[in-house]
Amino acid sequence: LTNEPTSLTDAYAFIKMRQRDGGDGPINVVVNMVAAAREGQTAFRALQKACESFLKLSPSLLGIVRRDAKVRESIRNQMSILSRYPNALAALDVEVIATKLAPRAACNFTASAAGA
């Protein structure tokens, strides 16, 4: 999701199709390419409000990745932002999101390994 209206429409349509097709599990949203966290929260709240009103579900905000010129430079150099510019704003934001996901991945891996 970005703060662009078309992105909001696309995210909502994706969530609606997922629900229609019987998708289960939580819906976690990452807001990307925003100038500041507040802008990302505003974009997320618009999506959340639409989902709650029309789909009767509430997605969760997994994280916000701020707009950062270092991302474009990383792409040009064909390297991840985490490798090329680990202290860039976007890299720090991605690390926060990864930290939130890591316990879930470990839990899913453990359950899978146990044959659950």
Report each predicted region and the residues it spans.
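Conserved Switch II/interswitch segment of TRAFAC-class P-loop GTPases
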Residues: L1-A13, A36-G40
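Alpha-helical scaffold segments in soluble metabolic enzymes
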Residues: A13, M17, K70, D93-K100
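Signal for well-folded cores of large energy- and translation-related assemblies
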Residues: K16-Q19, A35, E52, R66, ...
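Arginine/glycine-rich "motif VI" loop of SF2 helicases in the C-terminal RecA-like domain
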Residues: M17-G25, A50-S58
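Beta-strand-loop-alpha "switch" segments that mediate conformational coupling across diverse proteins
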Residues: F54-S80, V94
